Design a protein with these regions (language model features):
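N-terminal ligand-binding lobe of clamshell/alpha-beta domains
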Residues: 1-176
Length: 176
């Protein structure tokens, strides 16, 4: 089965399931061999700019059709059976609607699987859903069990209450 992943976390899941995608997002760099796969999209944003400039570029890109550009020629050449996308954030990765439009425009017979986790449990559920769809349900269950054991081991080593922590997602404008 030919799979394209447009989400770094999905790429990691695929490799954990023993599936090497035929194409990935420009941001997929783990495991290291993912970085050698064809990228089917690129960003219209200058990642070397400061956070205020990036925010301005993102707003302009949204007004001008999106933050990411799909390399339709590469996507067509890869002719995937399945494309893993995301539905969480319009600026974090290629929008689900954009990839569905590209699939339709190119006449590809590819199923788009959308990942939309809002919690760690949702991510683990996505792993199993992906495993079932790609005929790796036993491997997905095993990977999930290993991850849950690691989570439990870490939880057992941490105090019940810890310091209050705020995470700054972005500096300009401030996003907590």
């Amino acid at each position: 089965m030919r799979v394209v992943s447009l989400l770094p976390s999905a790429t990691e899941m695929l490799f954990a399931l023993g599936i090497e995608p035929v194409g990935v997002s420009h941001e997929c760099d783990y495991p290291p061999e993912a970085a050698d796969l064809p990228a089917v999209n690129s960003s219209r944003i200058d990642a070397t700019a400061n956070s205020g400039e990036i925010d301005d570029q993102v707003q302009d890109a949204i007004d001008d059709g999106g933050v990411y550009e799909i390399d339709r020629e590469t996507l067509a050449a890869l002719d995937p059976d399945v494309i893993v996308s995301q539905g969480i954030c319009d600026v974090c990765a290629v929008e689900d609607t954009e990839i569905r439009e590209a699939v339709a425009d190119l006449g590809l017979d590819a199923e788009v699987i959308t990942s939309d986790p809002h919690s760690l449990a949702d991510m683990l559920d996505d792993l199993e859903r992906l495993g079932r769809r790609l005929d790796r349900p036993d491997r997905a269950a095993s990977v999930r069990a290993d991850l849950e054991a690691r989570i439990e081991a870490i939880t057992a080593q941490t105090p019940d209450s810890g310091p209050r922590v705020a995470v700054l997602d972005w500096l300009d404008p401030v996003m907590v």
